[in-house]
């Protein structure tokens, strides 16, 4: 069982944040929800903290940077390219599509493949995103995530 946990966590670190290194190009969507979702575009800095070292011993706390764009033609989706900071430099972890729920003010991304199944849920709180990464279907909490938008990048 411990081997499965270590393998799972290795996938989380290398797979979740390193699978897709593509860069998404975005544009501002139209409409009310589009106006709300466009406010998410930019760079977000913060932390991803392990909360269950017993079950996921390979888990490491990380400083993270999320680059958020709205994919062309989408009004309810953002693409987040995630980096972790290693020795002061960004290291690509992956790119994921999140569904935006304007009513609940949440972003959700579910990832499933032959080896893992997990969900990332983030609450939008103004210039902060706070949430969790949990395994599915059991919803075992793995990480707590807190990031803040870098407003300097948005200004000319």
Predicted regions and their residues:
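Short beta-strand segments that buttress and anchor functional surface loops
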Residues: 46-48, 79-84, 107-113, 131-135
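Edge beta-strand at a domain terminus
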Residues: 27-31, 65, 91-97, 102-106, ...
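Positively charged n-region of N-terminal signal peptides that target proteins for export
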Residues: 1-4
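N-terminal secretory signal peptides
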Residues: 36-68
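N-terminal glycine/threonine-rich, aromatic-flanked beta-hairpin/loop signature
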Residues: 56-95
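Bacterial N-terminal signal peptides
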Residues: 8-19
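Boundary at the C-terminal end of the N-terminal hydrophobic targeting segment
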Residues: 20, 24-26
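N-terminal helix-cap/turn-to-beta initiation motif at the start of protein domains
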Residues: 27-45, 70-72, 153-155
């Amino acid at each position: 069982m411990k081997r499965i946990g270590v393998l799972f966590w290795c996938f989380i670190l290398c797979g979740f944040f390193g699978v897709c290194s593509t860069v998404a190009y975005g544009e501002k969507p139209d409409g009310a929800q589009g106006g709300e979702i466009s406010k998410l575009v930019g760079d977000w800095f913060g932390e991803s903290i392990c909360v269950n070292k017993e079950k996921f011993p390979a888990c490491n706390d990380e400083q993270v940077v999320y680059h958020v764009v709205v994919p062309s033609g989408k009004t309810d989706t953002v693409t987040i390219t995630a980096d972790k900071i290693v020795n002061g430099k960004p290291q690509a972890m992956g790119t994921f599509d999140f569904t935006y729920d304007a009513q609940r003010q949440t972003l959700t991304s579910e990832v499933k493949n032959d080896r893992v199944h997990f969900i990332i849920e983030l609450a939008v709180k103004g210039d902060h995103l706070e949430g969790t990464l949990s395994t599915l279907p059991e919803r075992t909490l793995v990480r707590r995530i807190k990031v803040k938008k870098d407003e300097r990048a948005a200004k000319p």
